[in-house]
Amino acid sequence: MDRVYALYPRYDEKGLELIRSAYGIASVALKDMTRSNGQPFIEHPDAVARIAYEEIGLSAECIAAIYLHEASRFFPETDIASGKFGKDVYTIVDGLNKISTINPKDTRLEAENYKKLIVSYSRDPRVTILKIADRLEVMRSLDIFPKLSRERKVLETMMLYIPLAHQLGLYNIKSEMEDIYFRHADPEQ
């Protein structure tokens, strides 16, 4: 049994092949990258994909888009346009890549304007949902980040991602992000 089938048994063979191809591209592109804790960076899209699959129930196209987004975000020259992924996947990757270029600190946007910008860059609602799944993974991994980065991520989550999760009906994710926020915002409690 292969790794992709073991992780995503609900998908048909076409979906599994899509994920295998995307994972293959990402694992090559990200092979030398590590997270703040020294672990391979590929663990981040793996964890986001598990959230998207297990907790939200998104399609194989969304799982493939997670891997392709991470590969093309860091390495724009990564060839994901070979035609085998389809328009849906490319639309999602494009939306995720556009959102990743927005930095609320740089643009000095108010939270509401930033949320509107995220939604406007996400012509497809799956893009926003995947961005929330990504943020949940970041929140679950907060301890690997330096203190200032952690504080910024916690604040962004409270101001931006928790309200978005609520608006989209992702109540379990919203609640978990709130719990993590309160643990980190006021660790004495």
Where are these regions (language model features)?
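Active-site helical microenvironments for divalent-metal-assisted chemistry
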Residues: 1-189
